[in-house]
A protein has these predicted regions:
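Basic, helix-initiating cap at the start of DNA-binding domains
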Residues: 2-11, 19-62, 70-71
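Short, basic, alpha-helical segments at the C-terminal edge of helix-turn-helix-like DNA-binding modules
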Residues: 98-105
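Amphipathic alpha-helical packing segments from all-alpha helical-bundle domains
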Residues: 150-172, 180-192, 210, 218
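Amphipathic alpha-helical interaction segments
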Residues: 50, 71, 122, 126, ...
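Hydrophobic alpha-helical connector segments
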Residues: 96, 109-143, 147, 157-158
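An extended, acidic
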Residues: 128-131, 139-154, 163-166, 186, ...
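Helix-turn-helix
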Residues: 50, 54, 58-92, 96
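C-terminal peripheral helix-coil segments that are non-catalytic and often amphipathic
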Residues: 2-13, 18-31, 168, 199-234
Length: 234
């Protein structure tokens, strides 16, 4: 993003997590995720929205590992059998949540300004802003990961899909083996920023932005070095 890039150059190097640069965001949108869940006025769409909102509410109130599908059905005001027709597991509900986040990112449109790094920064911050209202719930879900290896594998697969989408939206190829490698690298960057994001209480998410900017800069530096070495060897 050109405005962000100019601000970064004017303020020097990105701050560290211990002393982050107070970056200013210039977002055109402030996405509301909850409206993205429903796929229609009724039927499966309304069940999906009710299930996701109930799951997040329960995760925010207590340990996600203790939440059952029965708890989610009761919180959503749905018969358990009705819920299970659409979502046979908690993992399936989290998948619906992530698809809602993907829709929110896509609905905000493309980013065409700045370098590839700037575009990726904008798109990943767009995703984190959409997650912001649910940070407490998501931190509870993340804390339960060691007890749910199947859920972790499914979550990693969904994250790779989301990162491939992010690359494509930024105008970077996500096809073939090179695209998969890029998606895995971007997923690693994104995942490494989440612990900072969980704890970032600043009004403008400045600590999160500084951490993300620094990690993307590291990846950019490594890729530039690898390209230079490849040319030197040919």
């Amino acid at each position: 993003m050109a405005r962000r890039a100019r601000g970064r150059r004017a303020g020097g190097k990105a701050g560290t997590e211990a002393g982050p640069r107070r970056a200013k965001r210039s977002r055109r949108t402030s996405p509301k995720v909850s409206k993205s869940y429903a796929s229609g006025a009724g039927g499966a769409g309304s069940i999906e929205q009710a299930a996701v909102e109930a799951a997040l509410a329960l995760a925010e109130r207590g340990p996600w590992a203790r939440v059952t599908l029965g708890d989610i059905a009761a919180e959503a005001g749905l018969p358990l059998a009705t819920l299970m027709q659409e979502f046979p597991s908690k993992t399936a509900i989290l998948g619906a949540f992530q698809r809602g986040i993907d829709r929110t990112v896509l609905e905000a449109g493309e980013v065409g300004e700045g370098s590839a790094r700037d575009r990726l920064f904008e798109l990943l911050m767009r995703r984190l802003e959409a997650l912001r209202p649910h940070r407490k719930a998501l931190a509870s879900i993340a804390a339960a990961a060691p007890q749910d290896p199947v859920g972790v594998l499914c979550g990693w697969s969904r994250l790779l899909h989301s990162m491939s989408m992010t690359l494509a939206l930024a105008g970077i190829s996500a096809e073939g083996l090179p695209g998969l490698i890029r998606a895995k690298g971007l997923a690693a960057v994104y995942a490494s920023v989440l612990p900072v994001f969980w704890r970032d209480e600043s009004a403008d998410l400045s600590r999160t932005m500084a951490a993300l900017d620094g990690r993307l800069q590291c990846i950019e530096t490594i890729m530039t070095w690898l390209k230079g070495r490849s040319r030197a060897e040919t």
